[in-house]
C-alpha cells in the first residue's frame, strides 16, 4: 500500500503586513467571506477588488489546506479566482500560472443547465478542498488574497508589491 502522505511543507512566514483581520500565510494574506447570504462570482470578485485584492489563486496542496481551514463555517462552498479564459481554458484572475489543480472527480464538466443563462464558467471549492465548475451567478462564500505589504502611501493605503513572478511561494 501507499506510504501515508506527509503533511505538505509550509512556506516560511513572510515579514510583511496584512490588512486588518486578514490571515498571513507565506508571503500572502487571506480572507474568507462566508456569511449566510453569499455572493455571485462577479460580486465576490468585486468585493475583493474593492480593497485592491483579488479572488484567491491556489498554488500548492499546503496553500489549499490553509484556505480550507480558514473556511470554518458550513454556510457555503467558496468561490476561488479560477474562471474560463478567452481560449476556453481555465485561468486565475490574478494571472498567476495554473500549475496546481484539485478538481473533484468528473470535474470540470462544463454542465449547461437548461433555463440558466450561465454555463459553468466559475470555480468553487468544496469543504473537502476539491474544485467544481459552476454557474457564476450562484451565491456562495469566497476567498480573497493579497501580497503582504511593507509600506503605505500618503492616505495610509497599503502599497502591494507586484507579483511579477507569479509564484505562490
Regions flagged by a language model, labelled:
Residues 1-169:
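Extracellular, disulfide-bonded carbohydrate-recognition/adhesion ectodomains
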Amino acid at each position: 500500500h501507499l506510504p501515508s502522505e506527509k503533511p505538505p511543507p509550509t512556506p516560511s512566514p513572510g515579514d510583511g503586513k496584512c490588512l486588518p483581520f486578514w490571515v498571513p500565510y507565506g508571503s500572502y494574506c487571506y480572507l474568507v467571506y462566508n456569511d449566510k447570504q453569499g455572493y455571485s462570482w462577479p460580486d465576490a470578485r468585486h468585493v475583493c477588488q474593492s480593497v485592491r485584492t483579488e479572488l484567491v489563486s491556489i498554488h500548492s496542496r499546503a496553500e489549499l489546506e490553509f484556505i480550507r481551514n480558514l473556511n470554518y463555517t458550513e454556510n457555503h462552498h467558496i468561490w476561488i479566482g479560477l474562471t474560463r479564459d478567452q481560449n476556453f481554458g481555465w485561468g486565475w484572475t490574478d494571472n498567476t500560472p495554473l500549475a496546481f489543480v484539485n478538481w473533484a472527480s468528473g470535474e470540470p464538466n462544463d454542465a449547461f443547465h437548461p433555463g440558466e443563462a450561465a454555463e459553468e464558467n466559475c470555480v468553487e471549492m468544496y469543504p473537502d478542498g476539491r474544485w467544481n465548475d459552476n454557474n457564476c451567478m450562484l451565491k456562495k462564500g469566497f476567498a480573497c488574497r493579497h501580497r503582504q505589504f511593507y509600506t503605505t502611501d500618503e492616505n495610509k493605503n497599503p502599497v502591494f508589491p507586484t507579483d511579477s513572478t507569479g509564484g505562490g511561494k
